[in-house]
Amino acid sequence: MKINQVVLIRHGQSEWNTLNKFTGWHDAELDKKGKDEAKFAAILLKKEKFFFDCAHTSLLKRAIHTLQYILDELNQTWLSVKKSWRLNERHYGALEGLNKDEVIEKYGQKQVLLWRRSFDISPPQINIKDKRFPGNDPRYSHLNIHDIPLGESLEKTAKRVIPYWNKIIYPELKNNKKILIVAHGNSLRALIQHLYKIDNKAILDLNIPTAQPIILDFDNEKNPIKWHYLT
């Protein structure tokens, strides 16, 4: 692995992916396919002799467990891992837990696609009295209640992801650390859009598959050059 690379991986398939539900901040488990995907991602990394100095993931178990499977396969379970809510999936608001086909039937394909893929359009917000509100979860008890999302666009997701990149991850890259980030489709989309200056219309077409390693290439000054999937 070159020192000027960062590896991104979306978590493996979850039980709610299989059920075709909007997952967001719901803490869905990996299903069997997702576990196998995580192990296969590690095999791809091992084949190319990737080795990491540090790893980052979200506070959601589908990402945490994907990372654990990968580190186990790479014989790096001892690696220091930083977990942050800032790498969580975007919050799907009132859509969380709903079947995507049923939502499409109710609101239409065009509207749902905008909620899912556009840059600045948020889904309907959740009410703080709703049992699904993350403020009820002890893992977010350290957050100011005003920082806990009620429903996010990609733009809002980026506003929490990018500061984490700038303050925590990028200094590690500047220090020549080899970095692995296991997170979620939209938190990774937000990061890729920011680094590679993808415009707000083009980002609509970017859909990141589960457990497919993405290699970010940087020049010697640690400026992003290109990105590609490891296959």
Curated annotation (Swiss-Prot):
Superkingdom of source: Bacteria
Active site (UniProt): H11 (tele-phosphohistidine intermediate), E89 (proton donor/acceptor)
Enzyme Commission code: 5.4.2.11
Catalytic activity as recorded in UniProt: (2R)-2-phosphoglycerate = (2R)-3-phosphoglycerate
Pathway: Carbohydrate degradation; glycolysis; pyruvate from D-glyceraldehyde 3-phosphate: step 3/5
Residue numbers marked as site, Transition state stabilizer: H184
GO biological process, alphabetically ordered: gluconeogenesis; glycolytic process
Regions that span the bilayer: none
Molecular functions per Gene Ontology: phosphoglycerate mutase activity
SUPFAM superfamilies per the UniProt record, alphabetical: Phosphoglycerate mutase-like
Keywords noted in UniProt: Gluconeogenesis, Glycolysis, Isomerase
Binding positions (substrate): 10-17, 23-24, 62, 89-92, 100, 116-117, 185-186
NCBIfam families assigned: pgm_1 (TIGR01258), PRK14115.1 (NF010713)
Family affiliation: Belongs to the phosphoglycerate mutase family. BPG-dependent PGAM subfamily.
Classification via PANTHER family: PHOSPHOGLYCERATE MUTASE
Stated role: Catalyzes the interconversion of 2-phosphoglycerate and 3-phosphoglycerate.
Assembly, per entry: Homodimer.
Protein name: 2,3-bisphosphoglycerate-dependent phosphoglycerate mutase
UniProt organism field: Buchnera aphidicola subsp. Acyrthosiphon pisum (strain Tuc7)
Gene, per the UniProt record: gpmA
